[in-house]
From Swiss-Prot:
Designated name of the protein: Cohesin subunit SCC3
Ranges for region Disordered: 1-122, 1065-1150
Domain SCD: 367-457
Assembly and binders: Interacts directly with MCD1 in cohesin complex. Cohesin complexes are composed of the SMC1 and SMC3 heterodimer attached via their hinge domain, MCD1 which link them, and IRR1/SCC3, which interacts with MCD1. The cohesin complex also interacts with SCC2, which is required for its association with chromosomes. Interacts with LIN1.
Amino acid sequence: MTAVRRSTRIRTKSQVIEEDYDDEQNTSAQHVESDKITAKTQHEEEEEQDTGESEESSSEDDYEDQDDDDYVDTATAKRKSRKRKPKSASNTSSKRQKKKPTSAQKSAVSHAPAYHRSKKDQDQYLEIAKDFQPTELFDILSTSEDVSIEELLREWLETYSENRDKFLQEFINLLLNCCGSVARVEDHDVHSNESSNETIGEIQLLFQRQKLHEFYLLISKENKKRKNFKMGPLYQNFAEFMTKLLEVANDLQLLYVESDEDDTQIVTGNLVLDLLTWLSSFSVCKIRCFRYISTLTLYLFQDYLTQQAVNLEKNYLAKLSKQLSLEEKKKRPNNKTLEKLESTIAETQGSKVVIDSIIDNIVKLCFVHRYKDVSDLIRSESMLHLSIWIKNYPEYFLKVTFLKYFGWLLSDNSVSVRLQVTKILPHLIIQNHNSKSTDNSAIRQVFERFKTKILEVAIRDVNLDVRIHSIQVLTEASSLGYLDDSEILIISSLMFDEEFDPFKTSSFNKRSKFLSTVAKFLARVIKEKFDEFIKTHEDLPKEVDGLEVGPVVQVGIFIKILNDSLIYHLKDCAEVDSRTKIRMLTQAAEFLSPYISTHLKTICNLLISDTESNELIQKLQNSANNNSDDEDVDDEELDITPLFPIDRNSTILYLNVFHGLCAGANNPKIQTKDSVKEIVLPLFYDLLNAASIESADILCPLLESFITFSLDDWISIGYETELKKITDKTIKAFMDSTIGNSKVDMKYDIFAKFIHHIHHFEKKELQEKFLNQIATLKIHLKKFLQEKMDPNNSRDDYKDLTCSLYELYINKLTILGRDYPIEVDEELLQLFLNNFVSRIPIMFQDFDDSTAQEINFKMLVLLATWNLEKWREIIEKVRDYENSISKDLRSVWKPIAAIIGRLNTLVISLAATNETFENINSLFYLKWSACTSLMDIIVAIKIFELKLPADATTWRYSMSEQFPFYLHDNASKVLLKIFLYLESLFAKQVDVQLERVADEDANLNDLPETGFFENIETEFLLFTVKLKGLMKLNILDERFASRVALNKEKLGPLFKKIVDDTIMENPEPNKKNIQKAKSNQTQREKAPLQPNSERETDHANTENNDPDIPMTIDLEPIEESSQNNSELAPIEEHPTVVDAIDNSDEITQD
């Protein structure tokens, strides 16, 4: 094969200077024909857009599928083997394959351990390596952490003039040692640069025959942080060695020398020509590690050369030229000085020309090929060092010619390459923007060309890190005005991406980092738009009605852009309910808190003040209206007209943003909590007083904001006394409100959270207020039951009466009873059981679905569990409880027995009610609600019994006397029917054909859809957990258990674990089991039902029902109680029995 030697091209200076990129590329292509393997064709789209530039980048595009005989992973090897099959039929490939085996046969995985090879290969490798000794340079670089690289280089470079062949021999052997090659060259092998290709070819064959390889340089790079790694310093020392090599060579006058033909001409030194010749031959080798190390070495040379070129220009040529100019301006210039200055300038210019020539050759001989190498490591190194060259030498590299490579590699199929590119681009934009000496037209031109691709990567890339850094690129670009309004909306709307579920988003994961990055982008946009607005409204006053104009306008613009971004996000989405919109808006505000929380005082003042009469706001609104009348606004144009809380919708928007900003301050990484509480807490009561809190949409974000602050926060700023006024105001709203079912009424959850939060303050005066409300509610409830629900009076408004009963009394008592003890006298209990509970089967015919969903028996569970809790505390405190407590324990158990008996009767009566297609769902819901409460009470009683001291025989006897049975036989049958119903609904959802026993109802396969449950799987599994608890307590028999387990193989792994009693297993704490547990935890996170999946985070405004997940904590020890009661600790795990049982509306707590 005829080829033009690279050394010849380098020595021919006229060619180097005169030939353009295309001519040099064609010449290089002839020489590097063996590098066909390394080409990549990722940039076809870009090359089609610019055919002139495509000629530079496509010289190797036809070579992509050739053999690459170095380290490839298994997947790559398979892919390559598939690509090579058609080519193996060709004559050329066949001949090549006869000479040597294919790459899949002869190369190992990169730095793979020896046991990946056959015993024969290992023995052969050990035999070869037995007498092998690495070079002295390699030994020093790989083991010495404190070696003086400059001294080492100086001593070594001095040998070049004495013995050039030995010097090159040591240099090449150093590279080979770093690649793990046992082959080495002798001095006669490197005597002639003309034979460099042949020599490299022989080395390549020897390397392939070695079979086992260790790429020590790359291993050192990837393990540099590991302690006690034997070659830890190799990569760092090697990089410093090659970076300083030309610097020391320059000190020794080896970088450029005077020409032999013309003493005044400066030419490239022989050392550089030798190094470039051999390194360029290595860089087109088919061995990947050879290409990597030679490319890295050339790039490190270039790092120094770009610095030196600028150094010569700024520190020598500029100063010398200035001295020359000053000397020439003198009246009597000194001719000798002028001659000396001119001579020095000419010599320095000659040196810079040589350096520019070397830089140019490294680009042409290496970079333009290696930036699209088959190895993503080499492609990444190419982009990394190109950014260094642009930073060092912008006059040469900050051009479209080089910047386009970043745009092309945005489409790279390797995540690491795309990530490298997106990490570099923001710094390039910042560097260019801050530099006064360079023109930013190249950056602008390249950004405009690849802007669409950057946006696409930011929105759709499969790797979250790449998306994060792409948005950082757009953030810097937005500051320079490179983004249109429509493009700003595209990115800012990512704040509301439904993919980032609040259950998955936290301050410690990548999703959170993504939203934080978008928040930073949005904050930058808001600042830019504010500056733009102020420039166009210079006539605005500084202050109006006590409000500073600047912060008010900035807040208005922020709210407007945030609102427009949400609207844009929802434009192409399916219909989203209001709760989801609020959650998305609040979450966005949380992540914007670090940038916007300083404006919380302005937001509070706007919400407190009368915005309708504010002169400034009216003026801005009139200006906005005039602008909208004069111009047609595009839907995708970013409207920066400030938005203020002038109506109900905008007030709700402001309050939810206010809540998000307060919640975001709780992030410990932000450290704005102190400043936020000093702003918000003094104004909170005024805010609560000014707001229309009778509306749930306004009340919820306000109380959510209150919950984000602890008692210590109030005490630290001296506003603890405000808590009494806030509590009074909230209690009044609570008592005046009608509170419906928690699934449909947001007030249910927010009042429950507020009361729970105040309860944790442990302030007696505040707790007494809630206890007083319980007493008041009981009085009004008794009156309502006597007057409105008298069974002797025939009425036709049972539906409305039932809703009123729950909305005015039962739901409120249930909310209060979760934190404060509820005790009712026998009369009130009997009124509720007789006048309402026992009459439900009669009133049922007047109920619709919404009324049926309103009914629950949580208050009965609370009454029973608080009663048990009271006696448990007495038993714990009193030593001689057998004698000190009345022997007649009938009064203790009478109310609980009445509740259990009435719920049993209700369940049986509902089961006897005639089912129709219209009422089947509501009837099932009532039976399910009664059964779940009944099971909760039974488990609470059994826990109480199991926790009794061993000598409490009187208590145990009285319990057996008062509770001859817990569950009636007919009620047990109802439990089974409910299980079958839920099982059928879940099977229908997952499209599973169930097995059934002979006497089961065939209609269970055709049940209508029910809207009572948000998640059928959750309710089905939780009900199964309750049933398993009763089975462990021997309340349900084995026949029941066998039917529950009938379809355990078909209904998912979690159901099977519940049935098999393996869901709460705790493996031995050894390393192997810990790793297994982590794996299982990962699987559980992906499962449809998660133990915490129903617990709402602070991002949400509502909570889902979580009926009895904590029950599993209590049920598991029960099985062990027959052996050792001392191991039972369900009560101690919860403050009260109430907490252990009544979790049907459990509030998420920090």
